[in-house]
A protein has these predicted regions:
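Charged, low-complexity intrinsically disordered terminal segments
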Residues: 2-143, 153-164, 170-474
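Phosphate-binding P-loop/Walker A region and its immediate neighborhood
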Residues: 146
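Short loop/turn segments at beta-alpha junctions that line or gate ligand-sensing/allosteric surfaces
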Residues: 150
Length: 474
């Protein structure tokens, strides 16, 4: 009798789980399976993306390649801010680099600087809820933290709409934008796993209305006021908790130690190159399936190249529309290539599985594929066009970035910045091999490929056969 009762309870729990899973699946599929087309308004707007006209551009830019430099530059911006700091990030963890950023932000707030932080609501549920380090910051009188589209299992029709933006703005004059999240994988040089990525730092001493820094500020204000952005634990009473007091003290002491060691590097300096024009590209900010605005705009930029287009992306997950775009570019541009992680080097099982299955389809577009074999997963999202255009940001060459996430890409017209980007790209390409049409490799750099382990093979196999139907959601 007792055993029968236990079986009934287990069956009831399983039935509830399956009902919830079915509810979530139906809600997600109904909302996100239909992929919107490009509108006439986007087509018209795109025609003016990179026309160089009007007043002389006052913005300067420099690319940030190394993770250690990426942490230092963020601390430098925060430390030198006098009025306002804006931070938007997909993921924010309280590991070593995350605590340094938290400590720097807390120090700025103590100086009277107004701090606003926006974090994606799915990642924050994992990393920030119940975390005294974040409560110590959110309860500060000069700090506001909001979450974009907070995770809610009762609303599956909003589940897949995520905020993938990553940028930091100081005093409305200087900002960092790129593909790096706010934790050890991307910032600093701490032991353990790493992801290699790329940012660009932009400086504008006297911002004009049409400068990119104002484009980014306008974008932030719009998404900050969006109805799906809600405050994160802003009660001042949180500061009275012993666990929060202890966490704040740890942040303050840790940041002061880092500051003392790096004081000379953190002092304000000017080393950015002049630019002709910088333009911000952005996806819609709502949580539903999105018009592929950034994809279309990037495609038009690449189609207008005269000599070369070089893409770097961690993942390639395309539909027919995206493949067709690449086919058009390949027909128009003599030198068209892409570098991505090899199957063995890709830390994302969904990206690895889809690439393994569709590599030949990618080759059929006419694009040259280079596979990165550096050991740590490559996360950079950049495009090099001819000798004067550079595109850097958060956009992956996949359907999630195209149709589901908010995304930002910065288009910079500058031969000096273009050369910086080319040098950075080639450093990674020197650890890559070109895939040939027959499946063999051209290996001019004598690269030793990463071993595809049995464990990784099993992951790829399972994703391909169990989740391949949902490739547009990952």
């Amino acid at each position: 009798m007792k055993r029968h009762k236990i079986c009934k309870i287990i069956f009831a729990i399983l039935a509830v789980f399956l009902c919830v899973a079915f509810y979530e699946l139906i809600g997600i599929c109904i909302t996100y399976k239909k992929q919107p087309a490009v509108s006439d308004a986007t087509i018209k707007e795109t025609q003016n993306i990179m026309s160089v006209a009007g007043r002389e551009n006052t913005e300067r830019a420099v690319i940030i390649e190394k993770n250690s430099q990426a942490l230092l530059e963020r601390v430098r911006l925060i430390q030198n801010a006098k009025d306002e700091i804006i931070l938007s990030t997909f993921a924010f963890k309280s590991d070593e680099s995350g605590k340094l950023i938290l400590g720097a932000l807390h120090d700025a707030a103590d100086r009277g600087v107004h701090v606003r932080i926006l974090v994606d609501g799915m990642e924050s549920w994992i990393d920030m809820e119940g975390n005294p380090y974040f409560y110590g910051l959110s309860s500060h009188e000069n700090v506001e933290i909001k979450l974009y589209n907070k995770a809610n299992p009762l609303k599956p029709w909003k589940t897949m709409g995520r905020m993938h933006d990553k940028y930091l703005i100081a005093d409305g004059k200087i900002y960092i934008l790129g593909g790096r999240n706010t934790y050890n994988y991307f910032l600093g040089d701490f032991p353990g796993h790493k992801n290699f990525d790329r940012d660009v730092l932009v400086v504008c001493d006297e911002p004009q209305k049409d400068n990119s820094v104002n484009q980014l500020l306008d974008y932030f204000e719009t998404i900050w006021e969006q109805e799906d952005c809600r405050y994160f634990h802003n009660s001042k009473k949180l500061a009275d908790r012993q666990s929060v007091k202890k966490a704040v003290l740890e942040l303050q002491e840790g940041y002061q130690q880092y500051f003392e060691v790096n004081k000379e590097k953190i002092c304000d300096k000017d080393y950015a190159d002049e630019t002709e024009k910088i333009t911000l590209l952005s996806n819609p900010i709502h949580t539903q399936a999105k018009e592929p605005v950034v994809w279309y705009q990037l495609g038009e930029l690449m189609k207008n190249a005269k000599e070369r287009v070089k893409i770097h992306t961690p993942y390639i997950i395309c539909n027919d529309m995206m493949y067709n775009t690449w086919e058009e570019i390949a027909q128009k541009v003599p030198d068209f290539s892409i570098m991505t992680n090899s199957v063995a080097n890709n830390g994302n099982p969904f990206g690895a599985a889809d690439y393994a299955k569709n590599r030949n389809r990618i080759l059929e577009t006419g694009i040259d594929i280079w596979e990165y074999e550096g050991g740590y997963s490559y996360h950079g999202k950049s495009i090099l066009i001819d000798d004067d255009l550079s595109v850097i940001g958060s956009f992956n060459m996949d359907m999630r970035s195209t149709y589901l996430d908010t995304e930002l890409m910065l288009v910079i017209r500058s031969k000096e910045v273009n050369k910086q980007l080319e040098d950075g790209m080639m450093e990674y390409e020197s650890v890559s091999r070109q895939v040939l049409d027959d499946g063999t490799y051209y290996d001019p750099y004598h690269v030793k490929p990463i071993e595809l382990t049995e464990k990784h093979k099993r992951k790829v196999f399972l994703v391909q056969h169990l989740l391949g139907w949902a490739r547009d959601l990952f």
